[in-house]
Amino acid sequence: MKKLLLVFATCFLFSCATDNKKKDIEKSDPMSGIMVGKDSKSDAMLQFTKAYQENNMSSAKSIFTEDVVFNVNDTKMSFDQVNAGFSSGHDFFDNIKHTEFNVSTMYYNDGKIFTNYWYTWTATSKKTNNEITL
């Protein structure tokens, strides 16, 4: 019985030490942090994508500062460039929708903040009248 208690106590001590070590690593790792889905940045992303779907991108301009820089697939773009790019999709498609979407903002330990948005894109081609899902 004494050996069983000794083994249990030893395991308990090692498990506590491992947990603390993990927390120390997470705090010092710049690629660690917290991810949330209900914050002002995630809400702004939802407002932005709603404006895109409604083809009313100019209504989303107030979300951003005048010097905003969008990083779209390694390309830096201004709001006006993003507005023109996203709006041009409506020249070729009707009924653009985002379904099955998830949004979250990652607050990294090094102070960087990124908001991510995953979705299924659907629209109807103006040329073929076929619905497309991506």
Feature names for model-found ranges:
Residues 6-8:
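Sec-dependent N-terminal signal peptides
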Residues 48, 59-61, 68, 82, ...:
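Hydrophobic pocket/interface hotspot
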Residues 1-4:
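Positively charged n-region of N-terminal signal peptides that target proteins for export
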